A protein has these predicted regions:
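Hydrophobic ligand-binding cavity/cleft-lining segments
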Residues: 1-46, 162
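Short, surface-exposed coil-to-beta transition loops
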Residues: 2-4, 61-65, 87-91
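Beta-strand elements of well-folded, non-transmembrane domains
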Residues: 9-11, 57-59, 70, 110-114
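Short strand-connecting beta-turns/loops that link adjacent beta-strands
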Residues: 12, 73, 97-101
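Hydrophobic pocket/interface hotspot
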Residues: 15-20, 26, 51-53, 68, ...
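Glycine-rich portal/gate segments that line the openings of hydrophobic small-molecule binding cavities
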Residues: 37-83, 138-142, 147-148
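Beta-strand/loop substructures that line and gate deep hydrophobic ligand-binding cavities in soluble
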Residues: 80-131
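A conserved amphipathic terminal alpha-helix motif
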Residues: 111-158, 162
């Protein structure tokens, strides 16, 4: 299965890249009622880092471990090591449109688990991808466009803007 979503944010490439490099950005752009509980992750994501987190879908905890790969100014990839899919590779790409606008492109390749329970959970998650990424685009724009004059984001600032 493949999914692609693109949106533009009125913020420079460096600001968009820096925002996504903070592990706290995941929780900041996760739509309610889903809760992203991060168990272990560095403050700033770098090549080879792992994120261990739980996505709470109501009362259902979905534990996930992802490795961060191909990190650079223009994006990074998170690859599921353990989680609800048999295979999940998510490429986050950032492309400058001009000095003040950046395209954010999410490309996901996934395979459902063979186990019936996890296949149903994964399929439910997959079918909600358009809603998830519409929210993420809106929230990213909301956070970055009001703060794009600020050259750097901190985890504290991200936590202050749930």
């Amino acid at each position: 299965m493949q999914y692609r979503h693109t949106f533009h944010v009125h913020a420079p490439l460096a600001v968009v890249s820096d925002f996504h490099a903070h592990s706290a950005s995941m929780g900041a752009i996760t739509p309610p009622p889903v809760i992203a509980q991060i168990h272990q992750a560095p403050v700033r994501l770098q090549e080879g880092d792992e994120m261990d987190f739980t996505l709470w879908l109501g009362p259902l905890p979905i534990r996930w471990v992802a490795r961060i790969e191909h990190v650079g100014l223009n994006g990074f990839t998170d690859r599921q090591l353990r989680g609800p899919f048999r295979r999940w590779v998510h490429r986050h790409s950032f492309r400058p449109i001009n000095e003040t606008t950046t395209a954010v492109i999410d490309e996901i390749e996934a395979e459902l688990h063979r186990h019936l329970f996890w296949a149903v959970v994964g399929l439910g998650m997959w079918l909600n991808m358009p809603l998830l990424f519409a929210y993420r685009g809106w929230k990213t724009r909301s956070l970055l466009e009001k703060s794009s004059a600020q050259p750097e984001f901190s985890s504290a600032k991200l936590k202050d803007n749930p």
